[in-house]
Amino acid sequence: MSFICWGVFQENRLKPRCRQPRAKQNCFVRQLVKFLGLLLAFCWLSQSVKAETLLLKSSKGVPFRLNKVADGLGVPWGMAFIGPEQILLTERNGKIGILDTVSGVITRITGGPKVMHSGQGGLLDVAVPPGYSQRGWIYFSYSKAQQGKGVTTLARAKLKGKRLVTLQDMLITRSASTTGRHFGSRITFDGTGHLFFSVGDRGVRPNGQDLSTHAGSILRLTLDGSVPENNPFVQQKNALPEIWSYGHRNPQGMFYDKKHQRLWSIEHGPRGGDEINLILRGRNYGWPVISYGKEYWGPVQVGEGTEKEGMEKPIKFYVPSIAPGSLIVYSGKAFPAWKGNLFAGALKLTHLNRVEIDNSGKAVAEDRLLEGLGERIRALVESPQGWLYFSTDSGKIFRLRPLVNNP
């Protein structure tokens, strides 16, 4: 930056224009003040632009612009658009706000749930279903204290002015644990009156294969919290009826692709073995029996191997782990070349992960965007314009949009 400003100074050196000594002195002072003002403005503008905007290019040749929209937040865990330029966001410390994406101003919202903010727990996801503008319900996931243990909980409320009202817990899951780990959890909607809700194994590995606990499962409910009659384990003894799939470790990303009617999830493996899974009704996704990860304490494979009859293999796995914190299927018009791609935020390897999927649902290519940003990318959401917004654990919100807007 100093090099740029010095270059401007050299190109715009003052030239004496006054002949009389006093007039010359006054003239020089006026010109100096004017020049320094211009120089200061130029340098400030240069610093501002460089701090707020980065120009990058993906490996597929899609140019885009990255802007920082907001800063100074707690860990922004969930984001949902409730208007063309308004993002409702949750912070893990329990705070809720509405971000104006044009001005960057955040309006604080009161009336949220009382959260157990400990370890990986706190106020987690926020999501709004199709038809939000008519019904007004907003859905949250959070960790709730229950007899000294943390429990992943699904709740909903309505927004009235700057306050949440009619707050109600829809499902306090059977997932109590004293560990502060693996709460999940993401919320997504299929557009036909159902929601899906992920719950981590709570750091207790056997939970993944235990149908008598919600931990280590993806759940399916109606929008009022009741259990659909066609859930796979409704009639099975000792199985919880909310369970849609099981054998999961810690799914922190989940998205329902309405165009292809596919439910996708991404979950943390142990040391290696993060997975992208296509979630099907009643299927077992293997944790902790099968995994591509290794034990934390040594170079020993977790479980019995990477495949077993009756258990689903991931469509993609990551070794080493990227630590995925979110997942969406891109459907906008702003980036036509990315339509149908999966995007995930990487926490450990600090990038935006893009995966191309073919018509059969197989992963055919991967791209790692924004590796140079050095930020743990947490939540990810697509705007009505087709731009991507993401949050970071350092408390920032970024916007990624085309370098040249498409019609």
Model-derived segments and spans:
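Bacterial N-terminal signal peptides
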Residues: L36-W44
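Beta-propeller blade signature
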Residues: T153-G161, T213-L223
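Blade/loop signatures of beta-propeller domains
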Residues: A51-F64, P228-Q236, E295-K308
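Conserved blade-ending motifs and adjacent loop-strand segments that build the rim/top face
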Residues: V364-E382
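Acidic, Gly/Ser/Thr-rich repeat motifs that build Ca2+-stabilized beta-propeller blades
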Residues: A51-R205, G253-Y256, Q261-G269, P320-N359, ...
